[in-house]
């Protein structure tokens, strides 16, 4: 079942000069978010900046959230990732979607107006209710942590 999410265009260029977010293929999990800029931005190596998307969303459903993720090609080819690594959009947030972009590469990277800079995925949310206990029921793994299963 498809969920409908309210999207507010906060910059009139979105839907005109810059396309609305769409799923690239029927199997795509993420929608591409674009840089809603007046002019190109040069992001020097090591720099971080906030880039507007021109969109605001209100998910409203407390059973959903959105995550903003890097685009794989920008990270792999250019070293450009999200400054906060992953952005979390709560269901009650209603402001403009901003993308923190970090150039962890060695070269200056130019972000062009309308360029796809990140992707957004909607995910289910479960809020935990904590129960204080003295001990846990034993499991096969137990307290095995980092590297507990080996490498091969």
Swiss-Prot record:
Pathway: Pyrimidine metabolism; dUMP biosynthesis; dUMP from dCTP (dUTP route): step 2/2
One MF annotation (Gene Ontology) recorded for this entry: magnesium ion binding
InterPro entries according to UniProt: dUTPase (IPR008181), dUTPase-like (IPR029054), dUTPase-like_sf (IPR036157), dUTPase_trimeric (IPR033704)
Keywords on record: Hydrolase, Magnesium, Metal-binding, Nucleotide metabolism
GO biological process: dUMP biosynthetic process; dUTP catabolic process
Gene3D superfamilies on file: 2.70.40.10
Family statement: Belongs to the dUTPase family.
Protein name (Swiss-Prot/TrEMBL): Deoxyuridine 5'-triphosphate nucleotidohydrolase
């Amino acid at each position: 079942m498809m969920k409908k999410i309210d999207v507010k265009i906060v910059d009139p260029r979105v839907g005109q000069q810059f396309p609305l977010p769409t799923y690239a293929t029927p199997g795509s999990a993420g929608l591409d978010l674009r840089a809603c800029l007046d002019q190109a931005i040069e992001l020097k190596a090591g720099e971080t900046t906030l880039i507007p998307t021109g969109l605001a969303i209100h998910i409203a459903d407390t059973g959903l959230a959105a995550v903003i993720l890097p685009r794989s090609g920008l990270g792999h080819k250019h070293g450009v990732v999200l400054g906060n690594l992953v952005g979390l959009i709560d269901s009650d947030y209603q402001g403009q979607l901003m993308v923190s972009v970090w150039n962890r590469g060695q070269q200056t990277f130019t972000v062009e107006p309308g360029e796809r800079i990140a992707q957004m995925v909607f995910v289910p949310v479960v809020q935990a209710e904590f129960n204080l206990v003295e001990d846990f029921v034993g499991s096969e793994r137990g307290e095995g942590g980092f590297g507990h299963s080996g490498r091969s």
